[in-house]
Curated annotation (Swiss-Prot):
GO cellular component, one term: nucleolus
Subcellular location: Nucleus, Nucleolus
Biased composition (Acidic residues): 613-631, 684-707, 715-726, 857-870
Record keyword Hydrolase present: no
Biased composition (Polar residues): 84-96, 129-144, 152-170, 232-242, 259-273, 768-778, 1228-1241
Signal peptide residue numbers: none
Protein name: Protein slender lobes
Record has Phosphoprotein as a keyword: yes
Amino acid sequence: MVVTRARTRRLSLLETDSRPSTPQLDTVAELGTASPRATRRTRLNSSTLDVRTPTRTRRASLARGETPEPTTPSSVKRTARTPAKNTRSVRQQLTLTEEPEENEVKQEKPSPSPSPVPKEGKGKAQRKPSVSPSPGRTLTPNQQSDEKRVTRSMSQTPPMPTRSSSNTPRDLNDSPKVEQKAKPNIKTTPKVAVRLEKLSMDKFSGKKMEKAKPLIVPDELKDNGVVEEQNKSITEAHSQAPETHESAQPDKDAGKQSFLKSFTTLSKIQGSSKALHPDESADTITKITPTSTSKKIEENMDDVFETLRVESPKVERKIETLQKVHTVGTPEIKEKDEPVGVDNEIKTKTETPQKIEPPIIESKVETQQLIDHPQIEKKRDTPQNVSTVDLMDTSPEKDESMEDQEFLDAEDSIVQLEPQTDEPVEKPKELEFVDLDDDEPVFPSEAPKYVEDSKEVHPDDSMDDDKQNKIDVTEVIHLPSIRARAVRSPAVEQKKSVDFNNDTDDLEVEKKRFPKTPGREKVPVCRILTPKPETPLKLALQKGRNSSTPILKDQERGLSNSTEELHPAPPQIDAIKPFDELESKNAKDEMVEQSPMSKQKAENKILARLESFEEDVEDHGNEEENEEEHEEDKSISEFVDLEAEDAGKDYMSGDSMDSSLRREMEENEIPIDGESVGSKDTEESTPEESDGDDSFIVSDNEDEEDLGQLCYSSGEDEIEDAEESEQAERSSVKRRRIIIASPSDEEHDGKVQSNDDSSENKTEKPKNQSNCSSNASKLSEAAQLLNVSEEKSSISETELERSRQVALNELNKSERFNKTETQLDISVMEVDSSDHDEEEKTEKVGAKNNRSLYEIVDSDDGEEQDQDQSDADKPAESENHSEIKKSTSFMDQMSGAKGNKSVYEIMDSYETEDPKEAGKNEESDKDKPAENGKSDKDKQAETEMSDEDKPSEIKSPSTIKKSIISTADEEALLAELASSDLSHLEKMFNPLQKSRRQSLHVPSPELAAKNPKLRRRSERVEVGNDFCPSQSFVDMVAEKKRQKNKRKRLSKSLSGAPEDLEEMEIKHERKRLKSSHGASTDSMEEDNENETMTVAEEHHSDGEVSNGEVPIEEKPTTSSEKPSASELPEEEETVAVEELLMEKPKTCDSPRSEERPTEIVTSKPKGMAPVKVEKTAEYYLAYCHNLLEAANEAKLKEKKEHLASGAKQKKPKRIAAQAPSKLLGTIGSESETNTAKSSKQPPALKKDVKRLQAARQAVSHAVNLLAPPKATEAEPRTLSRKLSPQPPVVDKKSAKQKKGKKKQKPQEASPLKSSDEENHGHRIRTNAGYVTVVDEPPTKVPKIELIKTSSGMVRVEPCTPKQKYFRELPPTPKMHGFREEPGPSGMSRKRAKHAAPKVEHNSAKQAALRFKEQIFARRS
């Protein structure tokens, strides 16, 4: 049967039936045994309707041994109302538990009709087919005066007199109990009438329904013709049934007629109570079928009884018993049952019990239910369910004995009729033998089991017993009940129940077992929170750390170590036991304990050997803890003594880790200065793969030296050190990076000046080597170019220094704009590398290749990936070719001699924001031949410098060297970070965002490289001041933008409107031209245009978005600081910077900075002595402004980090917008005029606000195009992870900052005042007063880190685990044998962040479970 349909039928039939079954109370009242209102059923739900909820009265009566007559309807109801999962078992319970009581009550009067219906009732499977029997039940109330019983407090439908004739409703397949009652009343005389007593729904109905299901369907199939005949007979007997049932209770035929009449009434009532009964059709069918069955039974009682013997072996004994009793009533009921699927049994009973009267059956049901219920608990008193043939054979005997005990026979016959299963009826021996007389009061549900006893019991006696409600048990026949009936639950089972001996009964041999509804039965599940003694959590965390530390060899070691550690993870970290142990514990705690403990001990011994003695002690502690946990698993609240024993005096923070992990961490330990991607380490690993060294880690030795030099570039000393390190590196391995090229240059340079230059280059180059940064390569190569120019063009040292200064200035300019776009830096590097290439061609081809490789790295980093790849490929061939190709790609200038020019042009083409400088370079390059590339570049630089940088070029060589060294150190340090970051960032960005990766990839390395530049902001400011873009730069900007197909692609990919971006770039170029003139209004326009440009450039590249925004904004002074500040955050904050640009008007400042840097300060930073007083004043103002900006940018950087980490970005945007507006005003005024600063600041703020809004919109649009909704939050995280030299560290910092902020907010918001506004977030006003919401649990919980694992939430104890805590395992699931799922427990911990709420939630569950237990009379 489909549970839903069966339930609906039960609901419809059982409600009516339960009312018809209530009339049995009248019979019980006649018998005097029915407990008053014991049948009362609390109607919980339609689902519980089938399950006749044992009312406390019913339970009390059961405890008294009384079988409250309404119990049967209530049991039927319970089955109907039980939820779908429980319907099956509930149906079985219904049939046995309550109906036997009602059957007893009714068997006094209409026992013949109840017995057939109880048959169906017991076979709940029969309910499906016998939708018609439900009307039969409806008739029974009319038959019997039990209409009084109809009043049920629990009945969903109003109490119905038909319920008193629960015999007829028993016909209903929906209510097996009622059907059982009705069947014995109609078909069987008291002997044959099988009392449908509600055994505990769990025990009886579950098994009985299982058994009855096979009987029901086959019986329907077999007895469709019989059902038709029975329908006829029922229709005939339907009119007769009421009379017989009412007038002739002793007469079984009269009982049958009364049952039919009551059944007809019930059918009518059921038709009226369709709302209560989901299946009217089922009710109607049931009504029609039982009526016709009763009539036909009356007509063909004997014939059908014989037929039933033959057809259904289970029914045979019942049929004979019914014949003895009065087969007229019972056979009709059985025929009614035939439509239900008990058709064979119905036929048998229809033939046999012609005498059956509902009263007799009821008396039998009650008396025998008391007596037989133990038998039903024994699982089958009536062999009907087991083997109908045997029952048929014994039925005549039973009928004789049941003549003595008519009521017993009626009940037994009913029971026999109902079990329509093929199981042998004679499993009662397996069942515990229960004397009906002895157990009768205590176990009314077993009455059907005693139906086999009805063989010995005489039908006359059963008739008398029906009247008297007392059963004389001549023989106690133990028929196998459907389910093992546990006598132990008398409250439910005391009601006599008809057990259907079905195949399921054979399957379920345990008769005494208290049957739980299969849905209800819950296998005790092993503890799901099974902490593994050695949790891999720490190992996984350490693996993450190792992955964050990018040293390959160390990582490989770490991986091998981690794999080794996975098996024996240090148990000290977590004393949590593995699932295997815990699950095995639930099965057998102690046994499982010992085996895993032994395993743990073995592992702990190994670990102790590998690790320190403290770890071994901790392992023993863990074992003890595991034992404690095993012992405590039984208890609800488990004390998890995860506390590792005190590590001891010698315990170090890393001792708990495996020796391999500790070793790995020590080897990979990051120096305080930070790990550097040193040329030495990279050379050791792979000299030629220096380009491929994408690890964030900086080289250990030389990078540290380089960092020292960069930070403390004092000049020649550091240069000498750098030379030594470079020579060693050069000698050790040739690298693609410039470092090797610079040593080659140094080797080639035999001159002291060339050595000095090469020493400067070395100072720059080791940095470049370690960082592979375009800036470092630019500086070192620029110095090398100067040296080569000295060698080739025989220029004086001063000229070389001037050329170096020019190159450095250009590099600085390119860096300024490279902040926005790394292409400038790349071009600078390439320019230097091209010069170096010429030098290297003259000097060394291998050095050229190394340089070219390094330049390739920078070009890959600085340039967009398309050209970077081509450059990387071509420079590998030769720097000149790669640079020439670059120049052809960008500048369309192909000449090996013009390699310097082409490099500068490449720089210009790469310089999106430095296009002024690039333009100058290109123009100067075009104007001057590139035969002496370096000398030409020096001249070009001088031409550029001649505008503003000549004084700096005129600087003394020592001053030039110092400036070059300082800038070179600064830029080399930045270049190291940038270079190391660039290749790694390329790899990082490429998988996630190809378009972005290109754009972000170019700027982000420089940003990473520029992060350390903050140390030398002053020098950077000077470098920025040295850069003076000329108006030709604006032309070059236009050319660059036009020639920047890659950036256009980036803009297309990022902003999605490349053409618009190109137009915006053109506008930006125009505005930059205007800004180059230096008009304040132009600068303001340029700010707007620069914002658009920054947006466009940001679209070009995410890294460029951040860089472009700030670098464009950067003035000569601002450019030095902002590039440093912006470069530091840019890697992490590429998106954050975009947002900040949207927020800030710095973009407005950047055009001004660009315009005025060219105008104001270009040579000053390198020209130690300012050439112009105005420039010096502006320089100082710009320097102060840079300091202010540095502070602002530091704050902004923090905010950007928060943004990158995913912190709320709106707030940082607001802050950024406010701060930048101030910066914009200050910057604009400073760039325009020192005095005009303050005056221009407010208008700049207004314009900046508008610009900020426009920029924000553009940037937000671009960001949205780049990444849908998560662009602000998710992108910064990914970008920070990708761009940051050590993204995990940044993420950790950002996450910590977020956590700190969250913690601080509750602390700040802690309500000190009662006002709702101040404390509104944490203070809630209620009628009782103000409720303060305290975030204490989150503050406490973070101490113990919760990690979600397959076992659930695992608490990670601190490195020195000393905390003991109670892990409250919810007692409810374990106590009730429910599976404890980690999900709910983990969720509760997450929600409440402490285990207490789990118990609270479980308390509700416990209450519900207890309620269900009470309702279903069994433990859930």
